[in-house]
Amino acid sequence: MPKTISVRVTTMDAELEFAIQPNTTGKQLFDQVVKTIGLREVWFFGLQYQDTKGFSTWLKLNKKVTAQDVRKESPLLFKFRAKFYPEDVSEELIQDITQRLFFLQVKEGILNDDIYCPPETAVLLASYAVQSKYGDFNKEVHKSGYLAGDKLLPQRVLEQHKLNKDQWEERIQVWHEEHRGMLREDAVLEYLKIAQDLEMYGVNYFSIKNKKGSELWLGVDALGLNIYEQNDRLTPKIGFPWSEIRNISFNDKKFVIKPIDKKAPDFVFYAPRLRINKRILALCMGNHELYMRRRKPDTIEVQQMKAQAREEKHQKQMERAMLENEKKKREMAEKEKEKIEREKEELMERLKQIEEQTKKAQQELEEQTRRALELEQERKRAQSEAEKLAKERQEAEEAKEALLQASRDQKKTQEQLALEMAELTARISQLEMARQKKESEAVEWQQKAQMVQEDLEKTRAELKTAMSTPHVAEPAENEQDEQDENGAEASADLRADAMAKDRSEEERTTEAEKNERVQKHLKALTSELANARDESKKTANDMIHAENMRLGRDKYKTLRQIRQGNTKQRIDEFESM
């Protein structure tokens, strides 16, 4: 039995290990990969490897893996990458896994600055990336520093602004919070809808020369071929849609494009190496095929995939709605529980206050009762003394009378009687004054006792009211994805039909233009970042982008402009560059 060969395939978010036979073809390996990851939209992807010269190359599906210029190492290393890009992610990318693989690849391109992205858009995209990773912002879970381990912005953007890590996190967090309620899958799609409007998105650039020998860039993308000046890869100067191209061929380093318009001359350019022309040819054929396919009705397979995706999305939305409903119920229950706890605490505090007031009133009552008793005793003592004095007065009166009588009876001398009389009279007067004083004191004590009695009755009434306040029971808690330098020429006819006249891409607008929410967010971010920007660190791309913005240009307005005039006029313009 032939010895198997170890293969490692790296997708954007996983590493896969396979054992293949020496006669395994590129397609067999590719099929094994897509089956393993559950991918059905296979037409966008390919397997990439580094050849023995160090060039990045796409694995040919119709040849054996071992017959291709793959570095002989163990295991053989491949990357599973998107080779072709859709025109409109929201219309063409059906499966969640397809969207996710594109999202991760595009995000990597933006973060590495392979795709130029202005600062304000970079921050907005970062917030969608965070939503796709973490879901809704939760202050209880997403504490300060929760984004510390994530690379979210291009290094260029970080260096151009006087903001530290925490300040960047604060800004991204604010926009993360804005996406509350958005499914992770929807955040991925929103990211791609904004990213696809970036000028360098989905473009394969090749260094070429025209007949004059001018150094230019050729851009191959989903919509056609575009020509760029050497110092500006953001703004194409001439464009040729796939619908205008009849045949593409190369002979060594010379590449020839024959337009459908037979009155127009051939579009000729030169690449630095034969392998470049081979790659351009392959990309042109693949992109043209997809361009034509998009302008025809969906195949049964695609229709089924879309139906299944709609059903899965609907199911997720239903599940999300149920989860949200349960979450709201749980939050309401928690709030109710907190409210009950709060009310319980308030009532317990009120009860404590009442108990303290009652205790204080009780103490006051006891004090007033004690004073009342003391006053009563004083009153009784004063009364007793008054009675005693009255008795003594009476006795004095009687003694006086007896003396008078005795005077009469015994006929004492006038001087003696007068003396005794005077003494008794003085004594009587003193006793009368003492009696009146004591009676006055008794009346005074009687009034004080009456006031104390009234205070006592009032305190008793307050105590009775306080004591009658019902005891508060504790509330119940709620439970609740070329190298061959031989074969120096190749040609491919690009078939066309009536559908090719569909150039609807020229009518497209950017996501920011049609989505008021995105427009508002980008405007706010532009204003917010302006104060922190270090103008001295602007790159050439920053200045080109700023000029395009000033002139009101965007990707699709530029596309319409560079396709104006007939094919001959645009080819003549290319030759004169």
Curated annotation (Swiss-Prot):
Membrane topology: Peripheral membrane protein
Record PTM Phosphothreonine, positions in chain: 558
Effect of residue 558 to D: Completely abolishes the interaction between N- and C-terminal domains
Domain remarks in the Swiss-Prot or TrEMBL record: The [IL]-x-C-x-x-[DE] motif is a proposed target motif for cysteine S-nitrosylation mediated by the iNOS-S100A8/A9 transnitrosylase complex.
Impact reported for residue 171 to W: In IMD50; decreased protein abundance in T cell; loss of T cell proliferation after T cell activation; does not affect immunologic synapses formation; decreased T cell migration in response to activation by chemokines; increased T cell adhesion in response to activation by integrins
GO biological process, one term: T cell aggregation
PTM info: Phosphorylation on Thr-558 is crucial for the formation of microvilli-like structures. Phosphorylation by ROCK2 suppresses the head-to-tail association of the N-terminal and C-terminal halves resulting in an opened conformation which is capable of actin and membrane-binding. Phosphorylation on Thr-558 by STK10 negatively regulates lymphocyte migration and polarization.
Sequence ranges assigned to domain FERM in this UniProt record: 2-295
Top-level taxonomic group: Eukaryota
Phosphoserine PTM positions: 74, 407, 527
Biased composition (Acidic residues): 476-487
One example GO MF annotation: double-stranded RNA binding
Sorted UniProt keywords: Acetylation, Cell membrane, Cell projection, Cytoplasm, Cytoskeleton, Disease variant, Host-virus interaction, Membrane, Phosphoprotein, S-nitrosylation
The name this protein goes by in its record: Moesin
Organ and tissue specificity: In all tissues and cultured cells studied.
Outcome reported for the amino acid change (mutating residue 558 to A): Abolishes phosphorylation by STK10
Post-translational modification N6-succinyllysine, affected residues: 83
InterPro entries: Band_41_domain (IPR019749), ERM (IPR011174), ERM_C_dom (IPR011259), ERM_FERM_C (IPR041789), ERM_helical (IPR046810), Ez/rad/moesin-like (IPR000798), FERM/acyl-CoA-bd_prot_sf (IPR014352), FERM_2 (IPR035963)
Compartments, as annotated in UniProt: Cell membrane; Cytoplasm, Cytoskeleton; Apical cell membrane; Cell projection, Microvillus membrane
Activity regulation comment: A head-to-tail association, of the N-terminal and C-terminal halves results in a closed conformation (inactive form) which is incapable of actin or membrane-binding.
Predominant place of localization: membrane
Motif [IL]-x-C-x-x-[DE] motif positions after renumbering to this chain: 115-120
Residue numbers of N6-acetyllysine PTMs: 79, 139, 165
Modification type S-nitrosocysteine: residues: 117
Pfam families, per database record: ERM_C, ERM_helical, FERM_C, FERM_M, FERM_N
